[in-house]
């Protein structure tokens, strides 16, 4: 349910899900073929059959996350990243030994990757040009005034929910809660959530459907609208439908809304307007290219 903002997985940029598998942890995990040294001269962090692994091997991560800095990582994080690079190099060497890089399938895959990389590189260059554009102060101020209530008000709610497949199931659960005295409604809600919810996170945790705290934009629109309309200690008397199914929502608490000032919101506004300008320029440029290209669509 909740749209968690996740940190970039450091090793994610280096390998496929196969390579991401954790190595077995045992006393012999560092085999006799693996030597640890303190020699990191010339930026060489490790070698695999003579091939050096350097900080530049992690440039792909920096492209995705500009804040990435290998030198600022904790020692265990560095070791994990280096180990992942070693695992990748080992498999790469094995693939070359098997001459997989000479197969038609691999060559076709590389062509597809090159095409996609070229498109992304072109788009990156366009984005860099857009960042140089100064967004007028008045345009940012007007955007803030027009969108203040929707985008720049922070308010968190803490709620529970029960998710079921059908509206009839949801109505039955609401009816069961309705029968309870006020002092016992939340306890009944927790009991029914643990028993009936199809939300896998809640079901596995057996936490009474506790979603923790969330903001409006972190939930499906209809869910947020219903949740934030409640008062603490109250629950939805009619099922709330979303793409996930039907919800019954119980509100535990709700913070008072806090509106960001223009100055606080300004960096976000600038980014949003730059993104809008980028999309407009991309569409405009592509239309120009379309006009000058010979395009044939076969039906």
UniProtKB/Swiss-Prot annotation:
Pfam families: Rotamase (PF00639). The keyword Iron does not apply. Keywords: Isomerase, Rotamase, Signal. InterPro entries: PPIase_dom_sf (IPR046357), PPIase_PpiC (IPR000297), PPIase_PpiC_CS (IPR023058), PrsA_foldase (IPR050245), Trigger_fact/SurA_dom_sf (IPR027304). Residues 154-253 form the PpiC domain. One of its GO terms (molecular function) is peptidyl-prolyl cis-trans isomerase activity. Residues 1-21 form the signal peptide. It comes from the Bacteria. Its EC number is 5.2.1.8. The keyword Membrane does not apply. It catalyses: [protein]-peptidylproline (omega=180) = [protein]-peptidylproline (omega=0). This is Putative peptidyl-prolyl cis-trans isomerase HP_0175. It comes from Helicobacter pylori (strain ATCC 700392 / 26695) (Campylobacter pylori).
């Amino acid at each position: 349910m909740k749209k968690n903002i996740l940190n970039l997985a450091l090793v994610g940029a280096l390998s496929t899900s196969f390579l991401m598998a954790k190595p077995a942890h045992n006393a012999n995990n560092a085999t006799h073929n693996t030597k640890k040294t303190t020699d990191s001269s010339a930026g060489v962090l490790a070698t695999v059959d003579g091939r050096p692994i350097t900080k530049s091997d992690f440039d792909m991560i920096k492209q995705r996350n500009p804040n990435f800095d290998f030198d600022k990582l904790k020692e265990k994080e560095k070791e994990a990243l280096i180990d992942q690079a070693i695992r990748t190099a080992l498999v790469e060497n094995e693939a070359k030994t098997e001459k997989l890089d000479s197969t038609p399938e691999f060559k076709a895959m590389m062509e597809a990757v090159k095409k996609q990389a070229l498109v992304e590189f072109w788009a990156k260059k366009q984005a860099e040009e857009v960042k140089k554009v100064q967004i007028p102060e008045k345009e940012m101020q007007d955007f803030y005034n027009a969108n203040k209530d929707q985008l720049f008000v922070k308010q968190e709610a803490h709620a529970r929910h029960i998710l079921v497949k059908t509206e009839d199931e949801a109505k039955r659960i609401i009816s069961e809660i309705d029968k309870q005295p006020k002092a016992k409604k939340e306890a009944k809600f927790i009991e029914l959530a643990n028993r009936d919810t199809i939300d896998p996170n809640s079901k596995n945790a057996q936490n009474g459907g506790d979603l923790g705290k969330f903001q409006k934009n972190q939930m499906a629109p209809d869910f947020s609208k219903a949740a934030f309309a409640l008062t603490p200690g109250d629950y939805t008397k009619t099922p709330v439908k979303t793409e996930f199914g039907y919800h019954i929502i119980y509100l535990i608490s709700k913070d008072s809304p806090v509106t960001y000032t223009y100055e606080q919101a300004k960096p976000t506004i600038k980014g949003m307007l730059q993104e809008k300008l980028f999309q407009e320029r991309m569409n405009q440029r592509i239309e120009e290219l379309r006009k000058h290209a010979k395009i044939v669509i076969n039906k």
